[in-house]
Structures are given as structure tokens and as C-alpha cells.
Curated annotation (Swiss-Prot):
This is Small ribosomal subunit protein uS3c. Gene3D superfamilies: 3.30.300.20, Ribosomal protein S3, C-terminal domain (3.30.1140.32). Pfam families: Ribosomal_S3_C. The gene is rps3. Its main location: plastid. Residues 43-120 form the KH type-2 domain.
């Protein structure tokens, strides 16, 4: 039976870096992981809630969240396609987000600092593309049309290849199946190939669908 490794973990130290940077003793390690998960979930829910009003998809979502922890400071860096979409009509957008996250994990001894960085090529980010596909699937667009539109967006970002996989009750069929499409090269077994990856779930009226995206960015 084939064993598939996570493409990001496979390339750690070569061309990928950790997205949580901290050290903890073995007894408190699980608590640190749970804290990271709470921070990411809180930020994700806040962004979804406050950017839902904007019409159309323009690569506005979160690419990834990096968390750096020190003794007295938690530094959270949010990489977004369009930070302005979060700040539209909100004079204290980051401060409000920071307050919400601070309330979530109630850390008195450590300060929380949140920074938002704009991603240069949002359509080269698999998470943003997965959100784009998920939005179309929720609106009952054909899965093939949704995948092809995502491929067209990646062509604007000068990527070398992309592979998209959707699994579940596609188009409301009774039997779950897996559909995928590939454009260009996606060398998953080449460590020097810089490949970005995400796994995303979307809840539709027919059930939950799983979306996986691999993007081949460059080769070093």
C-alpha cells in the first residue's frame, strides 16, 4: 500500500521552513500545540467573518500563519493575499483582531503581537486557490470548471505546475470518488523542487469534500 508523506514536511530544511517556531519541555509540548491551533482558528474565523461582505474572489484569503514564541512574547505573522480587505471600513482592524485572540487563550504573562504581510503572488498560494475552488463548489459550479479556473489563475503567477484533487460526493453523486487534474510538472519525489501544498475541507449541501493542491514553484 502506498505511503504518502506530506510535501511540506518532506522538504523541511531544504526549501521549506517551520510555521511554528518555539521550544517547550515534553510535558508542556501538547499545550503549546493546542495554543497554536486556537490562535490559527481564531484568526481564520475573524478573517472569514470580516471579509465575507466583499464581493468576488480576488485572492483575499490567508495563505498561512507563522507563530513565533518567546518567554514574554507571542509573535503572529499572517500572510494574506489582500490585507486591505480585512481593514476596509475598520480603523482598528488589527487591534480588534489582537484583542479577540488575546481573549481566546488568556495569556497574562506574555504579550501578543500580530503583523500582516501581503503575499506577492496570491494565486501561487495553494490555500488561497483552495478557498477559491471551495467558494465555487458551494455555489454549485461544476468541479471541472472550478479546477480549470484555478489553473488559469496559477498561470498568472508564473508557476511551473499544479495538481488539484477533489474527493467526496462530487456533484451530489451517491458514491464518493476522487477526481484530479494536473497541468505542467509536479515532481513530488524531488526534494530540491520547491512545492507548496495544502489540504482543505469544504462543507456543501451534499456533504464534505476534500481539496488537495500541489503547486510546483521553482527548482533549486
Amino acid at each position: 500500500m502506498g505511503k504518502k508523506i506530506n510535501p511540506l514536511g518532506f522538504r523541511l530544511g531544504a526549501n521549506q521552513s517551520h510555521r511554528s517556531i518555539w521550544f517547550a519541555q515534553s510535558k508542556s509540548y501538547s499545550r503549546g500545540l493546542q495554543e497554536d491551533e486556537k490562535i490559527r482558528d481564531c484568526i481564520q474565523h475573524y478573517v472569514e467573518k470580516n471579509t465575507r461582505i466583499s464581493s468576488g474572489f480576488e485572492g483575499k484569503g490567508i495563505s498561512h500563519i507563522e507563530i513565533q514564541k518567546k518567554i514574554d512574547l507571542i509573535q503572529v505573522i499572517i500572510y494574506m493575499g489582500s490585507p486591505n480587505s480585512l481593514m476596509e471600513g475598520r480603523t482598528r482592524g488589527i487591534d480588534e483582531l489582537q484583542t479577540n485572540v488575546q481573549k481566546e487563550f488568556l495569556s497574562v504573562n506574555r504579550r501578543l503581537n500580530i503583523a500582516i504581510i501581503r503575499v506577492a503572488k496570491p494565486y501561487a498560494q495553494p490555500t488561497i486557490l483552495a478557498e477559491h475552488i471551495a467558494l465555487q463548489l458551494k455555489n454549485r459550479v461544476s468541479f471541472r470548471k472550478a479546477m480549470k479556473s484555478a489553473i488559469e489563475l496559477t498561470e498568472q503567477a508564473d508557476t511551473k505546475g499544479i495538481q488539484i484533487q477533489i474527493a467526496g460526493r462530487i456533484d451530489g453523486k451517491e458514491i464518493a470518488r476522487v477526481e484530479w487534474i494536473r497541468e505542467g510538472r509536479v515532481p513530488l519525489q524531488t526534494i530540491r523542487a520547491k512545492i507548496d501544498y495544502c489540504s482543505y475541507t469544504v462543507r456543501t449541501i451534499y456533504g464534505i469534500l476534500g481539496i488537495k493542491i500541489w503547486i510546483f514553484l521553482d527548482e533549486k
